[in-house]
UniProtKB/Swiss-Prot annotation:
Disulfide bonds: none annotated. Homotetramer. It comes from Vibrio parahaemolyticus serotype O3:K6 (strain RIMD 2210633). Transmembrane segments: none annotated. NCBIfam families: glgC, PRK00725.1, PRK00844.1. It holds the Pfam family Hexapep_GlmU. This is Glucose-1-phosphate adenylyltransferase 2. Keywords: ATP-binding, Carbohydrate metabolism, Glycogen biosynthesis, Glycogen metabolism, Nucleotide-binding, Nucleotidyltransferase, Transferase. Pathway: Glycan biosynthesis; glycogen biosynthesis. It catalyses: alpha-D-glucose 1-phosphate + ATP + H(+) = ADP-alpha-D-glucose + diphosphate.
């Protein structure tokens, strides 16, 4: 992958994920007990052999930039390897990026300094495993100018995606961004072919397309709305079907957009399945992250003799359960569960204390929260709604550093 440059779009506001994104960018939101959302895209790059990576930041990027510094300063600049966070440079005016294509257009000066022949455009806020090297190989074999990764989705969900129509050889014939009435697959009226927001461009094609698009006042400067539909008419654009054993990744069809509280919660809970739909345990595709140096998790008996219990849960380092009960939950590092406290079907971020006798059910608790003894959350939604955000499916979210 020496001839390819990765550009990760990591500047979105993530407003639907509020309050988890009130003080951090969406790609920096903790996930799965020890990771950040962007770790999955970065790991895919690392394991695919991509060693030149630009991360385009924008919205409340401090937490994201700190994570990149602490956990991803692993490449060797002397060998031309790097992961570089790029905040808006304001080289073409004072406004923030207007769309996905506009974000890269404003940084064409960086692309021009690179001798890569191909650009891999990625999003920093999806959960999945994918070998981009296999996609690039197919891009080269077909002589494509643009390759779009895609997957089958139920037609009822397709309006949230760019939907494609393709020929038998994979040539893209049509592309409609978030259509009200999505076209279906020729052989399956219950499914549509959806773009995953993963693109491989020939460098010269991308530069020209972005430059021409920037001249159009009527453009939304977005890949799905503007760039891809136009390239279909002038260049060879191919689809790359995601799913199955491609490259070095074990068979894995898992891809999730965690853009809402409910989808974020469900993706975390997927990790607790007896056989998780996404394999985090493939030894040669380990998900890398920054790991704080805490001692191993432990359970201890409380003063009343209660034993700390973990059942079907993910527990990070530094956790101490002193006579509490944790069931079907994800507990991040340096959390304290006190005597007779119960945590069920919940996600607890770093540095949280669950007070003695407290009950948490169907909750997400952000960092640095001290839950007082005998507090009930997720039991009475009417009372919870007076203090906290509750998702459409009833997940209660306690914001970072909330004071009871």
């Amino acid at each position: 992958m020496q001839d390819a440059l990765a550009v990760i779009l990591a500047g979105g506001m993530g407003s639907r994920l509020s309050p988890l994104t009130d003080d951090r960018a969406k790609p920096a939101v903790p996930f799965g007990g020890k990771y950040r959302i962007i770790d999955f895209t970065l790991t895919n790059c690392l394991n695919s052999g991509l060693r030149k990576i630009l991360v385009l930041t924008q919205y409340k990027s401090h937490s994201l930039q700190k994570h990149l510094r602490d956990g991803w300063s692993i490449f060797n600049p002397e060998l031309g390897e790097y992961i570089t966070a790029v905040p808006p440079q304001m080289r073409k005016g004072g406004a923030w990026y207007e769309g996905t294509a506009d974000a890269i257009y404003h940084n064409l000066w960086l692309l021009s300094r690179n001798d890569a022949k191909y650009v891999v455009v990625l999003s920093g806020d999806h959960i999945y495993r994918m070998d981009y090297a296999a996609m690039l190989e197919e891009h080269k074999e077909k002589g494509a100018k643009l390759t779009v990764a895609c997957m089958d989705v139920p037609v009822k969900d397709a309006s949230a995606f760019g939907v494609m129509g393709i020929a038998e050889n994979g040539l893209v014939k049509s592309f409609v961004e978030k259509p009200e009435n999505p076209p279906t697959l020729p052989d399956d009226n219950a499914k549509s072919l959806a773009s995953m927001g993963i693109y491989i461009f020939d460098m010269d094609v991308l530069k020209e397309a972005l430059t021409e698009d920037a001249k159009l006042e009527t453009s939304s400067h977005d890949f799905g709305n503007d760039i891809i539909p136009k390239l279909i008419d002038t260049e060879s654009v191919y689809a790359y079907k995601f799913c199955g054993s491609k490259g070095r990744v074990d068979k894995d069809c898992y891809w999730r957009d965690v853009g809402t509280i409910d989808s974020f919660y469900e993706a975390n809970m997927d990790l607790l399945e007896p056989v998780p739909p996404m394999n985090l345990y493939q030894s040669n595709w380990a998900i890398r992250t920054y790991e704080p140096q805490f001692p191993p998790a432990r359970t201890v008996s409380s003063a009343t003799g209660n034993e700390g219990i973990f059942i079907n849960s993910i527990i990070a380092t530094g956790v101490i359960n002193s006579g509490g009960s944790v069931q079907h939950s994800i507990i991040s590092s340096n959390v304290r569960i006190q005597d007779s406290a119960t945590v069920v079907d919940s996600i607890i971020f770093d540095d949280v204390e669950v007070g003695e006798g407290s009950q948490l059910v169907n909750c997400i608790v952000d960092k640095h929260v001290r839950i007082p003894p005998n507090t009930q959350i997720g039991i009475n939604k009417v009372e919870d709604a007076k203090r906290f955000k509750i998702s459409e499916k009833g997940i209660v979210v306690i914001p970072e550093s909330y004071q009871f």
